[in-house]
Amino acid sequence: MNRDQLHKKIDSFNDELINLRRHIHEHPELSGLENQTAILISGFLKDIGWNVRESIGRTGVIADFGPLDKGIIGLRVDMDALPIFEETKLSFSSKVDGVMHACGHDLHISIGLGVAKIIKDLKLNFGTRIIFQPAEEIASGARWMIKDGATNGLTHILGVHVYPDLSVGTIGIKEGSLTAAAGELNVEIKGKSGHGARPHEGVDAIWAASKVISGIQESITRKLDPLDPVVITFGKINGGNAFNVLAEKVNLIGTVRCTNRKVFQNIGTWLNENITSLANSCGAEAKVMFREITPAVNNNACLLYTSPSPRDS
């Protein structure tokens, strides 16, 4: 099949994939609960002749095609939605209150199923496995699937993610680290409660927390190599009980992102030292808990430059 024939083949079922994507968008499912999505995927793949295995990594689906003894190339597709209320007013908006495909996984599923239709007709001399992964948004599904053997036998694995900042028909590629490693940061600031009119008799945990929030951002710019950037964002803060009482305790929850593996491996220790120091400067104590969630995506140079042919879909 030459390129023109390939494009005609894609065009022949493009409307089918668009309708499929919109159906998935209307019926989103949260991480680990992708049961109906998995049924839809499995049925589609079985109908076009793929060997399908279900309930891999809980709600995941994997499908094989071609001569698996000649090496297997994998394509990974995520399929969970987010706990977000959709307000787009699209004709195919989410029909599930508080759940939305806001990260593009509905598109990823459609892309994966479209690839499955094409591969069936290419007569490749190696095997192909498409991995439909659950629970990407809670950074758990990949581990579940690996534990259940989803990657066994793979020689290479490919992936894709839609990116709204790129024009339609454009593919963004980069050698080495692309998306950053992710970690979860929990900080408990402990002070000493007291009356708001007599702050000198207590230790204001909210003041200490504000020092931590602003101070850690300043520390990043002065103490870490700017060529290996680190992003720290506190997304949740909780503390205090009354408007006129010093807060005894404040909890901060945030995320840490970094593309350099060595920096990421050491960032937990760095955060503990610097956050503790900032809290201590206010007379407070800090308990710092850092958890690595996912490593950075590292693009292999040998697979990267393969002359992709983008299509407007």
Regions picked out by a protein language model, each given a short descriptive name:
Residues 245-260, 264-267:
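A conserved active-site cap/scaffold subdomain adjacent to cofactor or substrate pockets
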Residues 24, 75, 105, 145, ...:
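Divalent metal-coordination and catalytic microenvironments
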Residues 263-280:
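Oxyanion-binding "anion nests"
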Residues 60-62, 233-237, 286-304:
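A short beta-alpha structural unit
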